[in-house]
């Protein structure tokens, strides 16, 4: 015990992190040991034990009950329970964290000691005599439902858990309600009850709410207690939590109308309190949440009975309007969306008409909340527009920006209910008003311009292209906008959102393009990025109008390339590529070549530089991306049988790209060229077949030289496109010879590397193999390398990264599906039975090793997200083995269980697991078998791998 206490002291002392980690590791191992049971009891029984030691002991006991209950002989369960109950009662006056921890221990023993049948009555009886205050029984009741209903907090099977939950919770709900009512009556009779006691009653009632019939809850005096508690600052949060939980139980309005009609008048009585709380942010936030969650729960009834529930909708609008701290309004967002979803249905047209004015007023409210912070000093306020961050730090700025987009979504809801035109007028009138003030020379704040512009951008997709009342007049006031970065950024993105409208109203095109183009000259990254994004949308949606101006756009591009940052330049290139794409096909080659010429020249210059810097490599990669954009997005139809002009261009520039691969072994450059090749293949498909020989040669050479996975994922594109049975024999032979060479290189690479060192390459390789299986399974299954592939897959199962491991498991799953005559996808022609039998024999040959690897991975090494993938391999493997030899299947499972550490699994548990396993295998209940395996392995992992308590922070 001294070592234990010393480790705890180290954790709480001002020692270095290494010592804390060592102490933490010791304590975690202690928590898993059989000796922990007795030592924890000793600590809790000693009056002189520190509160930290007692808390640790209580937490450890709870973990022992959850994970290691099998370590206690069944004949000791009653004695253990009684001892724990005595400890719990003795702690009635202890600090709350210790009392809560011991209550959780009692809840855990109540769940796992399945032979204990009168839990609530026994605990209540014990507490009545030893703890007249009721703290213990209330604390126990408040934690029991959560502990009992979470499958992650138990070692019981799902069936056992369901039975136990019914016995502990559902059969006791009314009795618990009666007990809570009796407790409240008793404490009131004895004098003035404390807020802490009543808060615990409300917390307990929240925990049990789902287990008690709603009519019994509504008939109890606890409803009155909850509403009265809203006047007590110490009980406000507990009361709101309970009432919100109660509202949530009334969502099925057809079944709970009576309860709603009882609660609704009481809620409306709180409106004066809501208004009075405008200067009390905490109370306003709590009450705002109460009204909003009531609206969410009753939204169906609100749509059906709009006149009756209009006062509630007005109250929720008041929450949005009066929330100066922007803390309560977020609770209303879901309600506005839910109500919109209801009233846009024709059957609720009356409700839509009634609520439209509220939604229109909500537009005004939202625009007001969209404003950036400002200062009354106009000169300083204007300078703020040049600041990158307007809040105390970047995180606060990012949170506000994210919050603005949420409010923008509410504006879209307003458009549906109040009408797009009305919302446009509401927003634009605010913008026009401030611009008139500006034009008259009076002082104004740029925030009053920026917020409506953001709002107009937010509702852009709601505005139809034939709108002819508002948008055109808004575009005409562009010259009146104040010139600062924040306003220009907002206005530019606003223009970019209305490009589909502009395509139908081309008379406004030049005005907007001039405004956007001016943004490129502003020395601000955000403004330039917005201009590039807007121009991209214009080039796509207005390409028919712009194709005649391609020469001017080409000059603009050449100029922009000299000063734009890479990201906005890419967006500009994407936009221009869309215009080039709709030219006559005869002009495409020359046009694309002219846009690519600067990038190709830069690539050539980079090839002769010695020892390029990282910045120079990144610039080279960016130029390769420009080439990728044009080769991917420009693909106009071309006459059948003719070489596509972009394919011809690819052939002409291939020597430059090939020499770049030969010159640079940097992963960044190889990946960018690989991306180019993959996009080119998928864009031009069979038209690109003439380039296949040079591409596959480069991929073989590149992978052999660098072992970069990027060459494998392009190989997969080649196989999927050109390795399918429909291809001619010569192409098929070339493709599968190419696949064989890539496999040979990979096997050699894996023979010299630990798989854990190359997870990404393994991921890319097995993605290639899955592409090969999908393209032509017969070629893969006939391959002489199939056994080597299976061996490589098994070797790769020692990986610990989720994505590559999932890829390997998916590959094995596909192989097993073929072996079981259940191919993972439809085939044009069935595969020969002899081929499938050979595959099955090969898998059976490796079945024991694969069985062990998969099971051990599921219980020890695989990431949690891979467990379902692993079971999707193990289950068909079990089917395959069981069909060949049932006794062998049981033997495999028995052997892997025998290899588990003895103290981690009891004999009774082992026998029960094997019995269920055998039963499910024999009856071919594969879904039940899968659930059985996944539930048990999840429980075992929690027992063995999960840290028993997070005792130190990660920072």
From Swiss-Prot:
One Pfam family recorded for the sequence: TPR_TNPO3_IPO13_4th
Highest taxon of source: Eukaryota
Record InterPro entries: ARM-like (IPR011989), ARM-type_fold (IPR016024), Exportin-1/Importin-b-like (IPR013598), Importin-beta_N (IPR001494), Importin_beta-like_NTR (IPR051345)
UniProt GO MF annotations: nuclear import signal receptor activity; small GTPase binding
Residue ranges of every copy of the Importin N-terminal domain listed in the record: 23-90
PROSITE patterns the record matches: IMPORTIN_B_NT (PS50166)
SMART domains: IBN_N (SM00913)
GO cellular component labels: cytoplasm; cytosol; nuclear envelope; nucleus
GO terms of biological process kind: protein import into nucleus; RNA import into nucleus
Record-given protein name: Uncharacterized protein C11G11.07
Biological source species: Schizosaccharomyces pombe (strain 972 / ATCC 24843) (Fission yeast)
